[in-house]
Amino acid sequence: DKDEVWSAKPVIYLYPEEDEDETCDAKPVAYLYPQTETEITVRLDYDGELTCTYPAYADGWTVSARPDGTLTDKNGQTYRYLYWEGVSETEYDFSAGFCVPGSGTAEFLEDALSKLGLNRAEANEFIIYWLPRMQENAYNLIAFQQEAYTESARLTITPEPDTLIRVFMAFRPLTAPVEIAPQALTAPARTGFTAVEWGGAECR
């Protein structure tokens, strides 16, 4: 069904939808960068159904995190980030955003993700995942979500990070350009223990 919202499911590293449509929160990944090696617990309060987590979520994730972002679980397994995917009925906000030609997606995302606070490695992983789903479209209507996402997917991180950056992109493929008010993109300075999350949803 072309009206369904979907996402591919690999590996936390709008026009109003019809009521019967689902929204897939695609590949939210979370990175943890403490100042010293620290045991950290991450819990997710999600207004929807989790469909996949890695490592296994259970009642939360507890890992030992290093300043370089390496995460180690109780069994000694290491991870680059925490991953989850879920399905919800969240209505994303497309009152402001960007209409971007598919051919200009990579350049747009490089600039936007930097303004939103992702470092080069994080932005690279974001772009590698999303670019194949966007560059062949004639245009993409893109809006980076604030409360619509953060209020439906609430994170509790213990100990609490000094800096929390959450980047969530909703986009809709278009066959022709549309006018939309531009969105202001800002980010806090990355100081102290920093936690970063990125994800997205493709809306059809």
Which residues make up each language-model segment?
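Protease-labile, long low-complexity intrinsically disordered regions enriched in Pro/Ser/Thr
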Residues: 1-204
